[in-house]
Swiss-Prot record:
Its EC number is 1.8.4.12. The active site is at 114 (nucleophile). This is Peptide methionine sulfoxide reductase MsrB. PANTHER family: METHIONINE SULFOXIDE REDUCTASE, PEPTIDE METHIONINE SULFOXIDE REDUCTASE MSRA_MSRB. PROSITE patterns: MSRB. Residues 2-125 form the MsrB domain.
Amino acid sequence: MLKKDKSELTDIEYIVTQENGTEPPFMNEYWNHFAKGIYVDKISGKPLFTSEEKFHSECGWPSFSKALDDDEIIELVDKSFGMVRTEVRSEESNSHLGHVFNDGPKESGGLRYCINSAAIQFIPYEKLEELGYGDLISHFDK
C-alpha cells in the first residue's frame, strides 16, 4: 500500500489536505483522467474511489458518484465562504479531500464527490496487485 509522510507533500498537496484548501479547477492532475484503476488517499494510501464511479461533471475537479467504502470517508458541515456545504475528509489521515453535493447522476444515486487531485493518487488497474491493492480487482469484474 502506498503511503506518504506529510513532510513529503508538495505545497499544493499540503494546502489542500492539511489546510482545507482547494486547487484550481481544470488545472489539476485528475479532472479529465479516466483510466481504469483506483484513487487512494495521498497520505494513508487507503482506497477511496474507483474509476468505475468517476464521471465527467464539467466542474473542473475529479468527480465520483460514490466512495469505495463509506467507512473511509468523514462528512462534516462546512460553512466557509458564506456557503453551507458538506466537506469530505479521509478517515485514516483526516485529510481534506473536497466536498460532496447532491447534483450527481441520478441513476448512480445522485451524489457528486468533488475531490481535489492533490489529495488523491491514481493507481492503474494493471498495478493493483503489485502495489498491494489486489483485493480490489474484483470491483472491476462486475
